[in-house]
Structures are given as structure tokens and as C-alpha cells.
Amino acid sequence: MLLIKWQKNDTIQDTLPIDSTLIVQKNLRLLLEDYPVRLFFHNDIPNPRSWDTLTTLNYQITYDAYTRLQTDYKKEYPTSLPKKSRANAEVLVDSFFVHHVRKGYSDLEFFANLLYPYLEQGYSIKLTAKGFASPLARNDYNVNLSKRRISSFKNYLMELSDKNYTQYLNNTAPNGAQLIIQTLP
């Protein structure tokens, strides 16, 4: 899982009057403090069995592959449960994919569309992205996996065809705005 939140004590830096800045800060804080974006991944994705900290995959690619596995999960998950618990297993899998996996992707799309106009207006914004991995592997491996998941989120933003997030992530925007993603694996 990857959690994206507003960094509470950070400020948005800009050249607009202070009143406008406070309104923008409040709107973004409400959005990300109250509704953080939670992204879910299939086990050991992206780049399974890799010690790399970066990936070339973007989150949409990993999401699409994960959602295609929903039927497999519905078949396999019940077999791991006691017989009396199997009846609701398919419903639980469907519920997880609808209320967590798909919702996370929908929240990401909403977030990307909402955030971009603030950057276009010259606001610099700092986000915190924290990666999580199951405790099945060694801790140092999970840290690298979490970093790859954060990398897939950044790649998603940079590859959006209708927005140029790259200039804000690489600090090359003509208006001086930046999108800073602090990683907390």
C-alpha cells in the first residue's frame, strides 16, 4: 500500500497575497488530511524480487494488472479459510477491490486533477508518500519495495498525457512552482 498525504506543518510557497495562500493551504489540507490517497498493489509489485528502489512502471500499469487478478483472488482466497467462513469470501474480495483498490485509483485521478491547477497558478506543494509492504520479506527488501511503489506514483504523475507534472517534479516550471514528494518508506 502507498499512502499520500499533505505534510501538516509545511507551507505552500508562492508570490500571491497571504489571504489567497491561506485559502489554498486550507483547501489542500482538508483534501489530503481528511482524504489521503491510498494505493494498493499486488504482492511484491512493482518489479518482483528486485532490490531496485526505482521502477519504470507507473501506478496505472500496476493497478490494471492487479484488478485483472480479482477473479483469481476470488478463487484462491476461500481455500485459505475454514469451511464455515468460505461462503462470504467472494463478497469480501469484491468488496476489497471496490472499496479499496478501485477507490484508491479513483482518488488518485481526482487528486491529480485537483492538484494541477494549484501548481499552474504558481503554488509549490509538498506531499508525503509512505510505502507499506507485507512483513513476508526482510525489512530492507520491503523498504526498497516501498520506494519502488512511490516511484510508480511519481511515474504516474509524469506520464499523464493531459498534464505536465514533470516540470513541477523536476523543478523546471517557468512559474517556479514545485511539487515535492517526501518519501517515508
What are the language-model segments listed below?
Residues F40, K126-G131, Q182:
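Structural recognition of the beta-strand scaffold that forms the well-ordered cores
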Residues L2-L3, A87-V91, P174:
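A broad, low-specificity signal for short, low-complexity segments enriched in glycine/proline
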Residues L31-E33, L119-Q121, A173-N175:
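A generic structural signal for short, solvent-exposed coil/turn residues
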Residues V101-K103, F132-P185:
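Periplasmic OmpA-like peptidoglycan-binding domain that tethers envelope proteins to the cell wall
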Residues I4, I125, L179-T183:
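Generic structural motif
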Residues D34-R38, G122-S124, Q178:
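Extracytoplasmic
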Residues M1-S50, T56-T67:
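Pro/Ala/Gly-rich low-complexity, hydrophilic intrinsically disordered segments
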Residues L22-I23, N27, N47-K130, K154-Y165:
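Periplasmic peptidoglycan-binding/anchoring modules of Gram-negative envelope and division proteins
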